[in-house]
Amino acid sequence: MVIFKERKPTENLFTRKIPAKYFIFSPSFLSVHYFEFYLPMSGDNNIEPTSRGSNDNSNGPSNGSSVNSNRYSLNAPKYSSQPPPASHTYLPPMSVNIPPIASKSSSIYSLLHQSSPRPETPNPILPPLIGSGPGSHKPSPTPTQPPAQPATQRQPATYSVYPASISLNRSNSSAYPLSFKSEETLNNNPPTAAKRTNTFPSIPSSTKKQKTSQEKRISSISRRNTQEIIAKQIAENNKSKTIEEYAQIVKHAEIKVLSMDSQNTSKAALQLAEQNRERERQVFALLWLMKNCKSQHDSYVPRGKIFAQYASSCSQNNLKPLSQASLGKLIRTVFPDLTTRRLGMRGQSKYHYCGLKLTVNESGSVSLNNNNASLSLVHNNDPISPLSSPSPSSPSPQVPNVSSPFSLNRKSLSRTGSPVKQSSNDNPNEPELESQHPNETEANKLDSLPPAANNPTGTLSSDELTFTHDLIEKVFNCNDKLSDNYNTQILSNTEHPLLTSYKLDFPKIPAGVLPTDTDSDVISSLESLYHIHCNSVYECIKFLKSDNISNALFFSNSNSISPTMFNLFISEPLIDWVTKCDLITYTGLIKFFSQFIIHSNEISDSIIQKLESMIKLLPEQINKAVLELPKALVQRKLSIINNFTKLVKKLIKLLKFILNFLKSFPIFKSGMNNDWKNIVNLDDILEMMINEDDTNSETNTIMQHLQGFCQVFVTKFLNSSMSVSNDPSVSIECKSLNEMIKDFCSFISLQSKFSCLKLIDCSTRFRNAIIGDISLKSNENLLSWLFLNNVMGQLLNYCFEVMKFVNGLKV
């Protein structure tokens, strides 16, 4: 409560009696109390206000007006002229002029800004200081004359700033006046000291907040546990399916999320698809655990070994694995009675799951026998092995330079580094990994890779480079075939076929490049995870998913890779292996997009625009993704991606020429056929191109071959375009152009004994001579001839650039 006092500055309170106006503001700020206290003159301090007569105006106003009709006294001690003791504080006796009750509540703003003194009125507008209680809101009638009480009956005064009838609760505050009690009632029931209670709106305490947060955490954990239980039930219901069969279901869920457009799909639908994808990934992991692990009390298996085998299975089925922590939780879900121990020699120990055994998978793709992974604790006489049980959440302390106590022979690792079979040697305690392809040697595997994969730096120059004899196979034939409705799928965001059945084939980490004491589980896990990473990049770029490319390019940010794996990944011995994997990834993309050249019916302006916008952002995204990598590895990656972007830009230019030619060719194909028959003379052109003095030169030979190609295949192209197509989905113009492009690439493959640059030079000169004759004699169909000339020229240059890219040369 705040009390303000208002008086005139010229008045002297010690020479005369003047009214002092007090404004009392309730803490609720919803009502204002107004009082007039009459202070006595000096010398009248011994007179008690209650003993004065009805006509005594000594404490009244100076004009002699009577205010005794509304004057009541407060129970206050006598005021003495002597100074009070220091230990006591007394208030002077005062008479309270309680105004009559108003019918309306007053405004604080108007009371504070009144310019003139408040007129005395018999109708007060503010509530009295003391009412009949907080529950009484109706005013009581004001008595006409309060009875005077003898001084002997007065009780010792107890002054209270907040009378008991006034409540500080905001919810109980009101602008309406409270009913008051008569003085008789007050004297018979003297007021007691008001107890100050805080009834303001309560603020939640920190304890309540902690309880709420704890409840939220418990709810979140319960929700996660419920999801794991549901996933376990689904896995148990699908135990009859093989790993490969359920991998198709998981891939279907991943495709559904990948095919959704965030701009055209609702947030709820996108979240539902992502939740379904995560649940299917959990079910796949649980199903893999049920088929490859079993509970056995006297066996144990390294914790990293289980993840290595699981990641290898994901790599074989082209799936993204769960993190090691998530897989550990699922292991506890399937096998709740497991214990964790750190076993092994000092300096070479690591965490093991005790009571778990890896078994042979039914499909044989991921298998471990009892002798190489799950060893009996009964025969373990090592006094150091029984160590204290660590926390399940503790990371596995695996160091690249420290070998596992049961290290495997790296020379016999399979292509994925995971399949393990029973060794045929005499010592069963020394397991040996066996390749899925026993007849395929390491040299044969490396020879099957592109030339640049064997020699990333490249040994051939552009002048020495020749076209291969199987150019169509190298450039256009891709195992991941371009579907007939690829254009529709990309633009309509539908599901994409063949994504579940195709994945790139990558080399394993070569034997001998790493120290012999490197943990085999770490090597196997790193191989599988980087293979999955490269396949993920391939899928995102293949389906032009610019939103997902940024996340796919960050290999180090994956939850599955541990610090030990990352340190091994950035080590110098693995730079060449990483370069080979990257080159295979982007070579596969080039071969996939090159299929547009021989499938011209799938080319559209929308596809070209999306491909062009994605390629513009790709270099910047790569630069952000390689910030944490060493300089040598960054240079290799940037070199590959820069050549890839340049090559795709040249492909886009070629596709634009093909698209423009197909738009104009149906109109001018009849005129072009007449020009070819009546204007073009190939013998005259050959005579101008060859050098008669050197009939055995390469230039003359190439020119003669070009003349023979034009006589046969250009004539075939123009004649076939005039026929009727049997396939209504493909126009006759597209079909004719596709056939001529294939024929031209086959012709180039036959010229493998000539250098690429020499062949390009001769072809350009011969074509320009043909266009020159047509432009001089007839220009009606010149536009379409120019488009065809550019298509053939850009096609030859593009094939040359692809040969440079796969051979590791700068594009």
UniProtKB/Swiss-Prot annotation:
Stretches for region Disordered: 48-92, 111-156, 181-222, 377-461
Biased composition (Basic and acidic residues): 434-445
Leader sequence segment: none
Residue spans binding DNA: 285-360
PROSITE patterns: RFX_DBD (PS51526)
Phosphoserine: residues carrying this PTM: 173
Single GO MF annotation: sequence-specific DNA binding
GO BP: negative regulation of transcription by RNA polymerase II; positive regulation of transcription by RNA polymerase II; regulation of transcription by RNA polymerase II
Low complexity biased stretches: 51-70, 377-391
InterPro entries hit by this protein: DNA-bd_RFX, RFX-like, WH-like_DNA-bd_sf, WH_DNA-bd_sf
Keyword terms of this UniProt record: DNA-binding, Phosphoprotein
Chain intervals with Polar residues compositional bias: 185-204, 409-428
Composition bias type Pro residues, residue spans: 140-149
GO cellular component: cytoplasm; nucleus
Protein origin, superkingdom: Eukaryota
Keyword Protein biosynthesis in annotation: no
Other information: Present with 377 molecules/cell in log phase SD medium.
Similarity section: Belongs to the RFX family.
Protein name: RFX-like DNA-binding protein RFX1
Originating organism: Saccharomyces cerevisiae (strain ATCC 204508 / S288c) (Baker's yeast)
